């Protein structure tokens, strides 16, 4: 069967890129992104175009949450054979090699030539026929996937064309109101691409484990420092820290985790986040009281013990529901 072209007209104005990051707890991060995507794509009578990108090439998972609903593919066609992010940037690398010194030191021009030579729509699939919701999966999961993912040289692509990733983001936001990037955890070149070069917004999910918040703080600091020190990257980066508790936390333990208690030797996450953002943005006064009163994710997300909203028959509007938690986040971040 011939694959029909996926045609997405340009949006009325540029969209925005939001990266979802967690130093650990990838399940919470991915489900938070998936739920956000469903709610955003439901806006304006389900006509808001949203693209999810699975950049966690080591442990990809968004394709499991969103089985393809793309009419270009035969039902029997194995999901393993569908191209995605990895194949797209393999093609970018090949184009850069073919260009040689074409464009010289004009990296913006080189990025334009590379991106115009690749049909990005071939790497994107529709995953919800009721909404304009799309996915660029991590890659084609054939026998060579693991080796190719390990071999992907994100630093090398950046060195060959520093404008490539920034231009890639701008390229996609001409067609999608929201581009949501599922970034792998830890620290790596891929993490730097996703948190420093691509986004307009960074949603950082963290758990009570101290290293979770420490890891997030390090990524935020490096991203903002880079943008402040590199002229071509000087654009705002809005940071939205998102606490994800643990099942069994009662009100007292949640408050202790949030506010801390010097007498018990507990440093709360709110004062640490407020100091982090004051230092990063160079502002004297900052309070997260109102924001953190509303934006808190359920502990079950950290264990991946809940279904994402797209898999549920209907959205639950209960005050303590998953839907309300994500809607509260989007009320601030989107």
Features from the language model and the residues they span:
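P-loop/Walker-type NTP enzyme "switch/lid" segment
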Residues: 57-170
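Catalytic cores of eukaryotic secretory-pathway lumenal/extracellular enzymes that build
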Residues: 27, 39-41, 164-165, 183, ...
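Short secondary-structure boundary/capping segments
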Residues: 33-37, 65-81, 85, 152, ...
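C-terminal lobe/tail of nucleotide-utilizing enzymes
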Residues: 1-7, 226-334
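Walker A/P-loop phosphate-binding motif and the immediately C-terminal alpha-helix
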Residues: 11-58, 64
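Conserved acidic residues
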Residues: 133-134, 177, 200, 294
């Amino acid at each position: 069967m011939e694959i029909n072209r996926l045609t997405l007209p340009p949006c009325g104005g540029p969209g925005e890129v939001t990266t979802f990051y967690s130093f650990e707890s990838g399940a919470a991060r991915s489900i938070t992104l998936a739920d956000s995507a469903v709610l955003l794509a439901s806006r304006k009578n389900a006509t808001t175009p949203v693209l999810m990108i699975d950049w966690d090439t080591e442990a990809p998972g968004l394709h499991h949450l969103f089985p393809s609903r793309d009419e270009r593919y035969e039902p029997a066609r194995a999901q393993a054979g569908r191209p995605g992010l990895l194949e797209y940037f393999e093609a970018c690398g090949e184009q850069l090699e073919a260009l040689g010194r074409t464009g010289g030191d004009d990296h913006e021009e080189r990025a334009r030539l590379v991106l115009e030579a690749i049909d990005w729509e071939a790497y994107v699939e529709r995953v919800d026929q009721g909404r304009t919701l799309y996915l660029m999966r991590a890659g084609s999961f054939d026998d060579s996937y693991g080796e190719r993912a390990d071999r992907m040289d994100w630093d090398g692509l950046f060195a060959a064309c520093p404008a490539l990733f920034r231009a890639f983001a701008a390229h996609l936001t001409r067609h999608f109101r929201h581009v949501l990037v599922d970034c792998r955890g830890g620290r790596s070149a891929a993490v730097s691409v996703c948190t420093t070069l691509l986004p307009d917004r960074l949603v950082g999910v963290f758990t009570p484990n101290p290293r979770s918040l420490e890891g997030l703080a390090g990524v935020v600091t490096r991203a903002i420092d880079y943008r402040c020190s590199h002229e071509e990257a000087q654009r705002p980066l809005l940071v939205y820290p998102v606490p994800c508790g643990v099942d069994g936390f009662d009100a007292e333990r949640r408050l202790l985790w949030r506010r801390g208690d010097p007498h018990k030797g507990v440093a709360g996450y709110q004062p640490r986040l407020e100091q982090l953002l004051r230092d990063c943005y160079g502002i004297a006064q900052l309070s997260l009281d109102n924001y953190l009163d509303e934006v808190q994710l359920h502990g079950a997300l950290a264990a991946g013990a809940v279904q994402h909203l797209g898999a549920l028959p209907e959205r639950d509007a209960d005050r303590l529901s998953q839907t309300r938690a994500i809607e509260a986040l989007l009320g601030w971040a989107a």
